């Protein structure tokens, strides 16, 4: 239990920050799922469009350090590879 005023304030802030970070992580997963769904449907133009928006989302979330930059790079790389594999 937070006993000092400072600790109580940090506990309040942690609740708000956790909710915000969870929302951002959810947005990341949704963006990735959108690309995966377009790839599974075989729609290359939709997959490319979804990837473009997902790339921006992934980068912004990595910049905010919600996910590690290497995880973001890995996600973008795998999505890009999945789209390229559609053409082959």
From Swiss-Prot:
Any one Gene Ontology cellular component term annotated for this protein: cytosol
Query: Molecular function (GO) terms listed?
Result: small ribosomal subunit rRNA binding; structural constituent of ribosome
Per the record, which residues fall in region Disordered? 1-20
Q: Which GO terms describe its biological process?
A: translation
Stored SUPFAM superfamilies: Ribosomal protein S20
Q: What does this protein do?
A: Binds directly to 16S ribosomal RNA.
**Name the record gives this protein:** Small ribosomal subunit protein bS20
